[in-house]
Regions:
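Short amphipathic alpha-helix that is part of the acyltransferase structural core
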Residues: 1-11
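Conserved acetyl-CoA binding element of GNAT-fold acetyltransferases
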Residues: 45-56
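A short helix-loop-beta-strand connector motif used in the catalytic cores of GNAT acetyltransferases and
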Residues: 15-26, 81-83
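Conserved GNAT acetyl-CoA-binding A-motif
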Residues: 68, 75-89
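Conserved acetyl-CoA pyrophosphate-binding loop and the N-cap/start of the following alpha-helix
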Residues: 58, 62-70
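Conserved catalytic-core motifs of GNAT/GCN5-like acyltransferases
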Residues: 82, 86-88, 98, 103-117
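Conserved beta-hairpin
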Residues: 22-37
């Protein structure tokens, strides 16, 4: 996460959270993880795409699309028809996500969060 410019959870948070991943993708190059993404949620009504990241040295090669395609395939095969799939799109990544059916929800709703201290 840090190498891709994303916030890094504490080791304890990662130990608790990662086992609850519904589906995850890791892209490897010469034994090193260079890209990742995962789906979390309740497994029925709500699914959230998180942790989409590709190392800067490997960006611009379509790897983000490969990650999203794998997650999208899994969601379409496993989520029930009434399920809602959401994500937070940073910057121009919204254009990638739009290719998989994601639409902006603003101004009807906005992303809100807080970090536990």
């Amino acid at each position: 996460r840090a190498a891709a410019g994303m916030a890094t959870p504490t080791l304890e948070a990662a130990r608790r959270g990662l086992p609850n991943t519904l589906y995850g993708v890791s892209l490897l190059h010469e034994g090193q993880v260079i890209g990742m993404g995962r789906v979390i949620g309740d497994g029925g009504s709500f699914f959230i795409v998180v942790d989409i990241a590709v190392l800067p040295a490997h960006q611009g090669r379509g790897l983000g699309r490969r990650i999203m395609a794998a997650l999208d395939d899994w969601l379409r095969a496993n989520a029930p028809p009434s399920a809602v799939v959401s994500l937070v799109a940073d910057g121009d990544a919204k254009h990638l996500y739009a290719k998989y059916g994601f639409v902006e929800t603003t101004p009807h709703s906005v992303n809100m969060e807080y970090q536990v201290e």
